[in-house]
Amino acid sequence: MNHFINLLVAEGFVRTNEPLTDQLVVHSVAGSGKSTLIRKFLEEQPLARAYTHCRADPPNLEGRFIQPFKGPCPDHFNILDEYCKEPISAKFQVLIADPLQYRTQHLRPHYVNHKSHRLGPETCKLLSSLGIKVESHRRDRDVVTLSGIFGSPILGQAIALDRSASDLLRAHGIQALCPIESIGQEYPVVTVVSSEPLRNVRFKDQVYIALSRHTEQLHVLSPEFPHTTSRPQ
């Protein structure tokens, strides 16, 4: 456990005041590097095993990769990624997740990380304006444009925040993902479409997921932005 905690601290995770137990709970935002941290731990610890409820790694020759979910391996150090997605059914040494992606009740964490290496400052400003705390750890600036729902073309991967937006896109020959379908995915360019103002969307986890899938450019089409505004790189 000490080795894993040392990795957390080295990667910028911050200790909370929650008393430590024999099961470590770690929370972090999108792009914080938690998957990279898990992979590094697997490389350094032969008895470590990691499983996820989301997108697993492709197998490798060494057998050290994040595997699809199954029960913990006896006599090993077991990590469960995205534990919030399903009820916890077994004992893992580490539970780790981005709880902002889920509506389910989560445990109180021992370590947290609000800093994202993937999301740029403009994206984080937009998320902050919606009451979602994410800090950018990128040195370069990202591109975010805000337009009315008919104010800009669809660029990159489309994500629809509601049924009306999805139906509208489909009518124009565009097959959009819903936020849940995009969990664990990354795209260079994303266009998020909402038929209502982002502040009015009932489930904030859906907004957070949709606005955090891009690596380079985010384009938001919503009726609250009648005139296109651009925050260039």
UniProtKB/Swiss-Prot annotation:
The (+)RNA virus helicase C-terminal domain, residue ranges: 134-233
Signal sequence, renumbered to the chain: none
InterPro entries: (+)RNA_virus_helicase_core_dom (IPR027351)
GO cellular component terms attached to this protein's record: host cell cytoplasm
Keywords from the named record: Host cytoplasm, Host-virus interaction, Inhibition of host innate immune response by virus, RNA-binding, Suppressor of RNA silencing, Transport, Viral immunoevasion, Viral movement protein
UniProt keyword Transport present: yes
GO molecular function, one term: RNA binding
Pfam families: Viral_helicase1
Source species, domain of life: Viruses
Location in or out of the cell: Host cytoplasm
GO biological process: one example: symbiont-mediated suppression of host innate immune response
PROSITE patterns membership: PSRV_HELICASE
Domain (+)RNA virus helicase ATP-binding intervals: 1-133
Note: TGBp1, TGBp2 and TGBp3 seem to act together for cell-to-cell propagation. TGBp1 is the main movement protein that physically cross the plasmodesma with the viral genome. TGBp2 and TGBp3 would facilitate TGBp1 function.
Similarity section: Belongs to the Tymovirales TGBp1 protein family.
Functional note: Transports viral genome to neighboring plant cells directly through plasmosdesmata, without any budding. The movement protein allows efficient cell to cell propagation, by bypassing the host cell wall barrier. Increases plasmodesma size exclusion limit. Acts as a suppressor of RNA-mediated gene silencing, also known as post-transcriptional gene silencing (PTGS), a mechanism of plant viral defense that limits the accumulation of viral RNAs.
SUBUNIT field: Homodimer and homooligomer. Interacts with capsid protein. Interacts with host AGO1; this interaction targets the host protein for degradation, thereby suppressing the antiviral RNA silencing.
Protein name: Movement and silencing protein TGBp1
Native species: Papaya mosaic potexvirus (PMV)
